[in-house]
Amino acid sequence: MLKVENLSTSYKLIDGDVHVLNDLNFEIHDNEIFGIAGESGCGKTTLLKTLYDIIEFPLEIDKGKVILSGEKNGQSFSYESGNIQKTWWNNISYVPQAAQSVLNPIVRLKKQFLDSIPQEDRKNETKEQTLARVAKYLEELNLSPDILESYPFQLSGGMRQRVIIALATFMSPNVVLADEPTTALDVVV
């Protein structure tokens, strides 16, 4: 479950604070789909970055907290913003609206997939076994495993976005935060 309690954020600018989120409260339960809609600039991306704990100057949390709790691999966990541990990111993933902000353009995709998998989740696999699991997952998403040999700059915008979605969902996180995930994707007719 992802729980937000009295969350307020603002951008600290020279000419004053710009408040973005004000006393936000909600809960997202396991297996629940939760959508956020609003006009451009209303704070949707700021909220997602705050939930993923990407707090970068000049953005600050003024008050409130984010709590992530659940179970993964048979073990319970609970984390609170401000006390984030590395394992927070093993349980939550983020799909940005711009794939180029996540993918390293000069590193092959197979290395980027391998680097995104925590060592403890490799289950004593060899690199080849892990890549075989990745290839099988890509096939389930109708992506060719051959794409692993590619560099992101060689792919179209839509293909990069599909790779980001695959990266974000491969480890079956408890929560997937998606910021306009269909950006650059083709409409299927």
Residue ranges of model-derived segments:
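A short, flexible loop at the N-terminus of ABC-type nucleotide-binding domains that lies
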Residues: 1, 10-23, 54-59, 81-83, ...
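Conserved signature/switch motifs of ABC ATPase nucleotide-binding domains
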Residues: 171, 189
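Conserved ABC ATPase "signature" region
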Residues: 126-146, 174
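Catalytic Walker B motif of ABC-type/P-loop ATPase nucleotide-binding domains
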Residues: 176-179
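The feature captures the beta-strand-to-loop junction immediately N-terminal to the Walker
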Residues: 37-39
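ABC ATPase NBD coupling module
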Residues: 72-93, 111, 119
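Conserved ABC ATPase signature
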Residues: 151-155, 159
